[in-house]
Amino acid sequence: MPERPYSTTVFRDAARALAATGQRIYANGWSPATSSNYSQRLNTDFAAVTQSGKDKGLLRETDIMAVNMDGQPASSGKPSAETLLHTQLYRFDGNIQAVLHTHSHASTVLTMHWPANSITLEGYELLKALQGITSHNSRLTIPVFENTQDIAALAAKVDQQMRSGHISHAYLIRGHGLYTWANDLPTCYRQLEALETLLAIELECRRLRGS
């Protein structure tokens, strides 16, 4: 059998960590049923990613597969088409080590009900949970992209916006969910938890304002 182009130990550790993280995400209600996908970089050319159609509340190590940076399988399993949105981030920045994508109630309602092309979070203490933010007197603008089945085209739009400096920690897809990334999986989960909490707060504030 030919040697794999990535460490099996690194893959096994990544699969274990992604499965455990996925169960935490599911328990918070951010990834119902088979929605969402999660990944972790294995090396320069490969990443571990959740397989398509897996129930996130029952996620196991065997539900994780390897793909190359073009989103093509490097182990058994079927990757989600959205894998290209993960690999775009890994190709864009070699420091990115983990990507988490969720389908929460708050992100869906906010992006479906309000037609703006971005959501701004400002003045929240919890913003300091995000990598590189040290003051609550900060403003985070999260771009909202239109949902599409043409994932390659969407990945190209995201890449263009990132190269223009318009995306820092996360982006949203209308009616679809949130993407965030970081230099390791625990930090990525921390950012996800902060962002999902802030989006839920923002939704409630807008309801109270009647806006």
From Swiss-Prot:
The protein's Enzyme Commission number: 4.2.1.109
InterPro entries to which the protein is assigned, alphabetical: Aldolase_II/adducin_N (IPR001303), Aldolase_II/adducin_N_sf (IPR036409), MethylthioRu-1-P_deHdtase_MtnB (IPR017714)
Keyword terms: Amino-acid biosynthesis, Lyase, Metal-binding, Methionine biosynthesis, Zinc
SMART domains (alphabetical): Aldolase_II (SM01007)
Cited SUPFAM superfamilies: AraD/HMP-PK domain-like
Cofactor(s) this protein cannot do without: Zn(2+)
Reactions catalysed, as given in the entry: 5-(methylsulfanyl)-D-ribulose 1-phosphate = 5-methylsulfanyl-2,3-dioxopentyl phosphate + H2O
Residues engaged in binding Zn(2+): 101, 103
Name the record gives this protein: Methylthioribulose-1-phosphate dehydratase
GO biological process per UniProt: L-methionine salvage from methylthioadenosine; monosaccharide metabolic process
Domain of life: Bacteria
One of the record's GO molecular function terms: zinc ion binding
Stated family: Belongs to the aldolase class II family. MtnB subfamily.
NCBIfam families reported for this sequence: PRK09220.1, salvage_mtnB
Co-factor binding details: Binds 1 zinc ion per subunit.
Gene Ontology cellular component list: cytoplasm
